[in-house]
Curated annotation (Swiss-Prot):
Keyword rRNA-binding appears in the UniProt entry: yes
Ranges for region Disordered: 221-263
UniProt family annotation: Belongs to the universal ribosomal protein uL2 family.
Full protein name: Large ribosomal subunit protein uL2
Lineage: Bacteria, Pseudomonadati, Pseudomonadota, Gammaproteobacteria, Enterobacterales
Keywords: Ribonucleoprotein, Ribosomal protein, RNA-binding, rRNA-binding
Cellular component GO terms, alphabetical: large ribosomal subunit
Amino acid sequence: MAIIKCKPTSPGRRHAIKVVNPSLYKGKPISSLIRKNSKSGGRNNCGRITTRHIGGRHKRFYRIIDFKRNKDNIPAIVERLEYDPNRSSNIALILYSDGDRRYILASKGLMVGSKIVSGFNAEIKIGNALPMKNIPIGTVIHNVEIKPGKGGQIARSAGTYVQLISRENSYVTIRLRSGETRKLESKCRATIGEVGNSESMLRVLGKAGASRWRGIRPTVRGTAMNPVDHPHGGGEGRNFGKHPVSPWGLQTKGKKTRKNKRTEKFIIRHRHK
């Protein structure tokens, strides 16, 4: 993994910082493991904008990732590491001994030729997946399930991980990078190690066009608008003189949006405390 600061041959390259991984495969993905990824432009089925700041973007295919890791006791070998435009982490193409191929998240330290396996009694080794009731306390894990059999939902971005800190009866306690501590069923599966490509956070796009390639449109400040367009608009100077609100007058910047209080009992320590 190399971090390259571009030469200032143009204003767009002056501040750009790229993350280059020479070990990534440069060919096309496996055709049986991709599907169409259509663009919405932030519009719903009526053609109305429901999410702002979305539009454009380079064409891309969605890579079908195996988040469940439920093919038990069949050893697999890492064929190659690939770039995935749909996520910050890289992905690994694995070949099972029965000939089946799947994409998984590339763990930190996973290399071409590495051998991995999933199962209840899998070895505690980078890339292996098993239920958390069989994982030692203090182990760093990622791709953690919230509901058994649903597939990993926690710690999937580049450089993220979760630490297993205790086990009690049929539940385990994990600590997230955000500081949140919560309980999960011990039957939930997780993958050993942390997600790779942690250097992706050091990437600097360098120019507005690089955001447009990713489908991100400009975000205009409310204070820069007219009163007809935004509650913060108009007036002299930059002060809008009221509590921050959305373009529709709803409270923002600090307003709590969590609705599912039913699962509050599983959270021991909130990330905001």
